[in-house]
Amino acid sequence: MSEPITFTAYAVKNLCYIAGRKMPAGSPAGIIIHSTGASNPNLRRYVNAPEICGENPYKNYFDRPDIDICPHGVVGLDKDGAVRAAKLLPWTMCCWGCGSGAKGSYNYSPAYIQIEICEDDLTDEAYFKAAFKLTAQLCARLMKNYPTIKLNNIISHKEACARGYASNHGDCDHWLAKFGKNMDWFRELVKNGGEEVVRYKVTGTKTVTRADLGKAQAQLIALGFDVDAEVL
């Protein structure tokens, strides 16, 4: 049995949890990745699990009845400074996460699993990589557990808005761009189970006669090389 990626900290006081609306048939249809938009990477800000996350004296986490938002999961730092993922709702319960767009809402039909990543000040590359790696691992696990989720439907809030099924937000693309990444990079990360693919540029030269030039070019093109030739 695979080890759990998340710890459970259900937001039982949140009205979304209390409503308990089940996802429709064919859902979860995808996953939306959000980021919080505030410089606070600590899970205790959003998750009521003091034994894991630490105490939040303000109690302004998602586990309260006076808030109209609740994602399925939150990724951030626990009380020991480790990147962890908290599960706030059952995966097959509709969350209140992305709002609505011109065509409807991915909160409901079709329903998407939605995960918040706690932002820091967007300058710590080590935290960025660790947080998105764990989120990618979680997405890969969810795809395995729910075959209705396809890779092209793992999207950001910004992408959900562009499709017409979410409110006008820019997360988490702005954070990805800080480190030269985008959602295509994240989807590839999910595809590879959270491991970033390292690519190498291979170049070389080979001298051939005019008679063999066409054959040599064809062989290199078949291997995926960009081919150029010059007279020596």
Predicted regions and their residues:
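A short, charged, amphipathic alpha-helix used as a generic interaction element across diverse proteins
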Residues: 209-227
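General small-molecule cofactor/ligand-binding pocket signal
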Residues: 89, 155, 228-230
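Basic/polar, cationic surfaces and motifs that engage anionic cell-wall
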Residues: 2-13, 19-25, 29, 110-113, ...
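A short beta-strand micro-motif
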Residues: 198-204
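N-terminal catalytic cores of peptidoglycan-degrading enzymes
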Residues: 1-108
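Short glycine-centered, acidic/aromatic-flanked micro-motifs in structured strand/loop junctions
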Residues: 35, 42, 117-119, 204
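Short glycine-rich, low-complexity/disordered patches
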Residues: 195-197, 226-232
